[in-house]
Structures are given as C-alpha cells and as structure tokens.
Amino acid sequence: MMSGSNSGRPALVLVAHGTRSPRGVELVAALAEEVAASVGPTRVAFVDVLGPSPSEVLRELDAPAVVIPAFLASGYHVHTDVPREVADSGNADVHVTPALGPDPVLAAVLLHRLREAGWQSGDAVVLAAAGSSDPRALTDVRRAAAMLAELTGDRVEIGYVATGEPRVPDVVARVRDESGRRVFVASYLLAHGLFHSRLADAGADGVAEPLGVHAELVRLLVSRYRAGVEAVRVTAGAGAAPRHRRRVLPVR
C-alpha cells in the first residue's frame, strides 16, 4: 500500500508486527492513511504473519526512506528483525527511528481509551502488554505503566497476554481481591488481533480498545518521521553514507 503524493521527500515505511485479524490489518492501514495526509508517501510493512516485509518494501522504493517501527516496546523485532530487514533490502539510504513506545503521548491515548471503556478515577488499572523475553522490552513496559500511573494518579499493575508472567487474568483477580475496586484493562496494543481478543476473558469490569487510530498517535508518528527527514538532510549534506548503514535516531 502506498499513500500520499509528496514524492520529493523520503517515503515513510511503517513497520508493524502483523496479524491475521482483518480488523487489525485495516486499522494499521487506516493509521498509515492518516499519517500520509501530513507527510506524503507512506508504506506499511510487517515483520511477521503477513507481508510485505520491510526488505521487500525498501527494495521496491529504491529511494531514501524513514522506517518507523510501530512497536510499543523495543524487543526482538526492533533490535533484530528490523535491522536485518533493512540490511537485506540493499537500500543504502534508510533511517530507522526508535520504536513508538514507551512515550507520554501513548500514555495519554491509553487514558483516553480507558475513559471510553467506562473507567473513572478510583478504579484500578491493569496494563495489558504482549510480553517479551527481551529484558529491554520489559523495562519499556514498566516505563509505560509508570507514565500511565502519573496520569491516573494511582498505581498501574502489569499483566502479559502472550509471553511472560504474570498473566492478565491473574493480575485482574489479584487487584480486585486486594483492593475491592472495579478493575479496568488498558490494552497496550496497537491494533485488534489475537492478543486483544484474549482480554475479553480477563475478568475485568472493562477492557479498553487498543491504541488504534488516534489523533495524538498520528501526530507522534508525524513527529518521528520529520525527525528522520532532518537526519536524511544532515547526512546528505555531509556526503553519501556507506551502503547498508542503519542510522538510529534519538527519541524526540
């Protein structure tokens, strides 16, 4: 998929995990469309489940690109899959931004989704993350929970949906037993899919929607892209870069 028409600027390649859920795929496509309205040519690639892969998209472009890993924590996909895909593409002019999360913007979107689900001040919150075996990703999830806790004014517990312990249903049950309060699940997932569907059986009083297409998330993506474009310009001014070089930009 390609959207936008500002061909004079580097293309944006939004890299997501991938899902068999048609609703999830449509959501990622809709997010790309919203971003494209501000930045121009935007492509979507997936590292798992379905294609096209990042390397396929970057080979097709054969032009400067800014790659944004649309992951909420920096685990295996961010540290291993994305760099490998960039190298395999043979595209010499690719700038890779940090992963989307954790970020205060995402915490604000999580709070909005919780309120949509019926959460009120005083209700307990469990942050539901996919999970990872990478300690760096788990650290990112803890940071995300701390950011959300600053906004709710209360502790936010963490539960995992796919990898790691404790599992979301166990955390929900423990928090309810200990506090006697209503418990809501904040879905720390980008889109609908298998992981989000599991949250319906978590036993919570309410489950928030995934981050999805939200104006603040779109603005965050646009900001990351523009930081990447500035890096492209700086590199171009300094001369050509070696082939297969991957540049990781600082978090803005």
How would you label these PLM feature ranges?
Residues 1-252:
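Active-site-proximal alpha-helix that buttresses catalytic centers in soluble enzyme cores
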